[in-house]
């Protein structure tokens, strides 16, 4: 798999990504490898067994657990959530209509959150239940079943649903009924159970790449976000999905349950006309092939998982740096598996300008950009989208000064780009910086 290694090395060397782990499945063949480092401070190498925070890929485990409980007769997917969580309350009478299936498919009309309190995490057993109780003041943003609206909040409610209907904590149920039966013995939703020798550190690309002062963990948001796993163990998860519920003779889901999990329930929006949401999973096409996918991003970590079930191929990529070019990575490796010529990602031009921008200011960075346009057109990616990718990342992790400089530079280079102007407006509304 030298070509896979070439893609990974290009990302680590050219995109400021501290560490990256790749898992590839083709039929029953599995290839896993780590690249880069777990932390730029320790320089310990990433391996296929290094544990990464997965962010929203966690939701695919939640959905499988809920469907598993439905198989056991402990809940019905089309029953109202209130049937199993009678104390669940929103400040909107329509919430009484929300079904389990609607919550799983992000069609419940639930709002979302942009504050996970990573800087003030809760670790106790009651954290999830307290969070769900705190939603009593929230209102729906649409009628249940009306449209797709991605909601992390909805998956916290589903986590409590798993706990109530199983009689176990959310984390214990997932561990005993999904992770351990699949041999995913190092994987865990509990940060305190992450083996230190396998742990990875979150990083942020300013540029340059720095260690994040926050770690994305809060037990109140475990179901939506906090599974830790490795490329090696996630390949077991992928194989179970490709085999429709079975791994090495151990069945954790009925074959027919994948008709529910991968059913295209609702189009996600007009900007993605061929993308639909299933039960947690997203369904679209790539190169004319059906693709099942989920990705994730939180402070310092980014992940992506792609399954092409009709070809029995899949890829997972885990990075301990944001932003990371996950689409480029996944598309290049999937192309390889399909027998196509991959496009090796070019590093963003911002990578060669970040320290100039912070140390010497806008004008020198502009001059550097113009020079590279003339001399390095084949070496760098000059897409203005990179200013948005890095800018919004910096905004979300509250690195406002760096965000401001990045947006200013982008606007200087692309004065007619309304998206960059919008980034500056959002920054101004956040902190009053003009």
Give, region by region, the residue ranges found by the protein language model:
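Active-site-proximal loop and beta-strand segments within enzyme catalytic domains
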Residues: 14-15, 26, 37-152, 168, ...
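Catalytic loop of the DD-peptidase/beta-lactamase superfamily, centered on the K-T-G motif
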Residues: 1-33, 118, 122-123, 163-176, ...
């Amino acid at each position: 798999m030298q070509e896979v290694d070439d893609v990974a090395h290009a990302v680590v060397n050219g995109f400021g990504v501290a560490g990256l782990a790749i898992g590839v499945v083709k039929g029953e063949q599995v290839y896993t490898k780590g690249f880069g480092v777990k932390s730029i401070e320790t320089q310990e190498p990433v391996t296929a067994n290094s544990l990464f925070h997965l962010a929203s890929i966690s939701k695919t485990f939640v959905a499988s657990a809920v469907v598993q409980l439905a198989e056991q007769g402990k809940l019905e997917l089309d029953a109202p959530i209130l049937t199993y969580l009678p104390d669940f309350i929103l400040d909107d009478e329509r919430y009484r209509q929300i079904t389990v299936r609607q919550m799983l498919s992000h069609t419940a009309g639930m709002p979302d959150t942009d504050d996970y309190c990573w800087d003030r995490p809760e670790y106790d057993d009651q954290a999830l239940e307290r969070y769900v109780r705190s939603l009593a003041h929230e209102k729906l943003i649409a009628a249940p079943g009306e449209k797709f609206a991605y909601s992390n909040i909805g998956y916290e409610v589903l986590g409590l649903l798993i706990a109530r209907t199983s009689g176990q904590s959310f984390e214990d149920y997932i561990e005993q009924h999904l992770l351990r039966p699949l041999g995913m013995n190092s994987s865990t939703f509990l940060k305190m159970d992450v083996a230190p020798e396998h742990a990875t550190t979150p990083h942020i690309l300013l540029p340059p790449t720095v260690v994040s002062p926050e770690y994305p963990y809060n037990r109140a948001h475990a179901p939506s976000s906090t599974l830790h796993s490795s490329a090696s163990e996630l390949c077991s998860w992928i194989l179970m999905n490709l085999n429709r519920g079975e791994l090495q003779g151990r069945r954790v889901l009925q074959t027919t349950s994948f008709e529910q999990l991968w059913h295209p329930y609702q189009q996600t929006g007009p900007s993605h006309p061929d993308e639909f949401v299933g039960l947690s999973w997203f369904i679209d096409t790539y190169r004319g092939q059906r693709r099942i996918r989920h990705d994730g991003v939180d402070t310092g970590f980014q992940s992506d998982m792609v399954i092409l079930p009709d070809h029995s191929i899949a890829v997972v990529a885990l990075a301990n740096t944001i932003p990371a070019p996950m689409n480029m990575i996944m598309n290049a490796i999937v192309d390889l598996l399909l027998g196509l010529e991959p496009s090796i990602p070019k590093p963003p031009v911002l990578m060669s300008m970040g320290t100039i921008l912070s140390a010497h200011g806008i004008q020198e960075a502009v001059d550097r950009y113009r020079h590279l346009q003339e001399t390095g057109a084949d070496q760098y990616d000059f897409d203005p989208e990179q200013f948005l990718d890095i800018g919004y990342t910096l905004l979300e992790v509250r690195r406002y000064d760096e965000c401001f400089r990045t947006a200013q530079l982008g606007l200087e280079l692309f004065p007619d780009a309304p998206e960059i102007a919008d980034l500056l407006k959002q920054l101004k509304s956040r902190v009053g910086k003009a």
